[in-house]
């Protein structure tokens, strides 16, 4: 069923409403009795000033009504049925991270539109680390006068170091954050209201440390009083931060409405309201863009859709990076995937070129290692993977031999896939390819947030995961360190393969101060992953959004970690 914001009849009524009001106003003026002027006194008393009668205005004398400034309401639609969590320390899906990005800040931030540059955010400046008692210390001086949003009748209040410490400790708590593993070996101090110290047991390079305190994942700062007052569960649907937009309302399976934060420390936003709509049907999102009922909409990350919408009147298609890695993780705790021959058989069955052909040249690039070499230090090139003998060029005869050796010739698996096209179509392509060697993959389509919950409950033997992380350490720690194994890990995260063989390499690289040696350790870890066929890197998928031409982001969009074209205080509608 198509979902649009307004029906045709509603749109016609909206067009006629202003004319109806004008006619009604004129009718009331003509029907009103004439005013009776008070008699003018000969000598007006001081205590009673002259009451000058006001004549009834004629049609030619009636002043033109004063127009109030038009509200700037931006309507964005996501490929999702509903939100999952707006607690920034749990937000993972596109529709959640987008809202979180508008509501919260970090100590520092990625420059909007360009992830290659850091900027101060809640902090006044980006510090250099110092050493105290053989420990690395990062000291942040906070901006003064930054206000937390009001909530549930409570007034906003000034954010201080107490809020930042509370937020970092929450991010480091596995019971209250999906990103706790990022903060192992850190302690946090507040010497005064505007100073925050982060103390590390093991030193980290700026490239590894700074992303942990940015406007990303666990680095988002929540307001302590609001979080404690609402409680963790309510906070998931009523976020309170310091960002340019503040939470106003949530209608399940329909919309989140945000209002401009007039007290935002960078200045009041140019938009008055942002409406984030949940519309999983691509036809409805397209129609909304074409008919002007949506201003921004998540598109299909596929070449035909880009070409179709590029030709739509008044619509611009934004394709931007860095994109996300698309990787197939194979759960070794599930028989027969515990047998490396079965995992290698699956790898030999898959054909990267088929995925690239399906998604298209504008959106997809081949991926040969868990860490993408095009963007991050420590990634592996196609040549390096090939020389190591772990590229797994498509060889379905070899795949069938390996399955026979493992006694898994008639293997049948069931996996849950998101309704989102990027997930569903990737799973369907894998399903078709596995069928060529006798493997049956049954797919259950669920809404996006449910899929995220199920795979974290270890429900899938095969997990397609689409993600970006800021550096090789985060990629390897969160997907392949034993602490990150879903459900059973010390700090469960996204190790869907239950892989345990590279902890020492990950930890050694993390504290290595020589960048070249650090990259070598990361590469060694990935070659081991590939040798053991714990995961199979498929491709990199860029972001695609359709935008009305009158939407001005207020910055040049090249890349973002927020998974959508960021809406900032400078975003506006120019129509």
Features from the language model and the residues they span:
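Detector for C-terminal structural segments
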Residues: 251, 349-380, 419-432, 453-575
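Aromatic- and charge-enriched surface segment that lines or borders ligand/interaction sites
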Residues: 125-176, 197, 288, 336-338
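Surface-exposed binding/hinge segments that line
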Residues: 141, 176-226
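Gly/Pro-rich hinge or "lid" segments in bacterial periplasmic/extracellular proteins
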Residues: 111-113, 204, 212-269, 273, ...
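N-terminal lobe/hinge region of extracytoplasmic solute-binding protein
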Residues: 77-131, 169, 240-242
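Ser/Thr-rich, Proline-interspersed low-complexity disordered segments
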Residues: 26-68, 574-575
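Alpha-helical secondary-structure segments
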Residues: 75, 160-166, 193-199, 243-244, ...
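Ligand-site clamp/hinge motif
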Residues: 233, 261-307, 431, 440
């Amino acid at each position: 069923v198509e979902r649009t914001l307004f029906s045709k009849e509603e749109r016609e009524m909206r067009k006629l409403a202003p004319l109806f009001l004008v006619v009604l106003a004129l009718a009331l003026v003509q029907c009103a009795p004439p005013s009776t002027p008070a008699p003018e006194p000969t000598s007006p008393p001081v205590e009673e000033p002259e009451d000058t009668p006001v004549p009834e205005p004629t049609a030619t004398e009636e002043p033109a009504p004063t127009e109030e400034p038009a509200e700037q309401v931006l309507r964005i639609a996501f490929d999702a049925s509903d939100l999952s969590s707006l607690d920034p320390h749990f937000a993972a899906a596109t529709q959640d991270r987008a809202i979180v990005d508008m509501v919260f800040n970090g100590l520092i931030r990625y420059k909007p539109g360009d992830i290659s540059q850091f900027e101060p955010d809640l902090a006044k400046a980006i510090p250099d680390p110092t050493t105290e008692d053989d420990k690395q210390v990062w000291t942040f001086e906070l901006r003064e006068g930054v206000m937390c949003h009001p909530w549930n009748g409570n007034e906003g209040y000034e954010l201080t170091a107490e809020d930042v410490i509370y937020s970092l400790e929450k991010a480091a708590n596995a019971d209250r954050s999906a990103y706790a593993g990022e903060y192992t070996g850190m302690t946090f101090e507040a010497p005064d209201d505007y100073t925050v110290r982060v103390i590390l047991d093991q030193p980290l390079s700026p490239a590894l440390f700074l992303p942990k305190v940015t406007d990303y994942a666990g680095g988002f700062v929540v307001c302590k009083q609001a979080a404690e007052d609402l409680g963790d569960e309510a906070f998931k649907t009523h976020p309170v931060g310091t960002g340019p937009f503040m939470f106003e309302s949530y209608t399940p399976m329909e919309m989140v409405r945000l209002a401009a934060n007039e007290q935002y420390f960078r200045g009041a936003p140019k938009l008055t309201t942002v409406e984030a709509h949940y519309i999983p049907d691509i036809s409805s999102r397209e129609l909304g863009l074409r008919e002007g009922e949506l201003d921004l909409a998540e598109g299909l990350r596929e070449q035909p859709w880009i070409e179709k919408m590029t030709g739509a009147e008044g619509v611009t298609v934004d394709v931007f990076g860095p994109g996300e890695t698309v990787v197939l993780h194979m759960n070794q705790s599930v028989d027969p995937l515990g047998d490396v021959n079965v995992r290698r058989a699956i790898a030999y069955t898959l054909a990267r070129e088929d995925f690239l052909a399906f998604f298209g040249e504008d959106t997809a690039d081949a991926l040969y290692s868990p860490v993408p070499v095009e963007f991050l230090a420590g990634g592996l090139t196609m040549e390096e993977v090939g020389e190591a003998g772990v590229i797994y060029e498509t060889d379905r005869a070899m795949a069938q031999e390996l399955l026979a050796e493992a006694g898994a010739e008639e293997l049948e698996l069931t996996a849950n896939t998101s309704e989102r096209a990027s997930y569903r179509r990737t799973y369907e392509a894998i399903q078709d390819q596995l069928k060529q060697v006798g493997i049956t993959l049954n797919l259950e389509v669920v809404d996006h947030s449910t899929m995220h919950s199920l795979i974290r409950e270890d429900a899938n033997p095969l997990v397609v995961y689409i993600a970006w992380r800021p550096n090789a350490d985060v990629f390897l720690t969160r997907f392949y360190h034993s602490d990150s194994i879903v459900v059973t890990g010390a700090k469960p995260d996204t190790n869907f393969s239950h892989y345990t063989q590279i902890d020492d390499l990950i930890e050694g690289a993390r504290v290595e101060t020589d960048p070249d040696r650090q990259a070598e350790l990361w590469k060694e870890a990935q070659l081991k992953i590939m040798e053991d066929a714990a995961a199979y890197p498929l491709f990199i998928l860029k972001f695609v959004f359709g935008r009305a031409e009158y939407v001005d982001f207020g910055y040049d969009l090249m890349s973002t970690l927020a998974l959508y074209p960021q809406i900032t205080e400078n975003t506006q509608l120019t129509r």
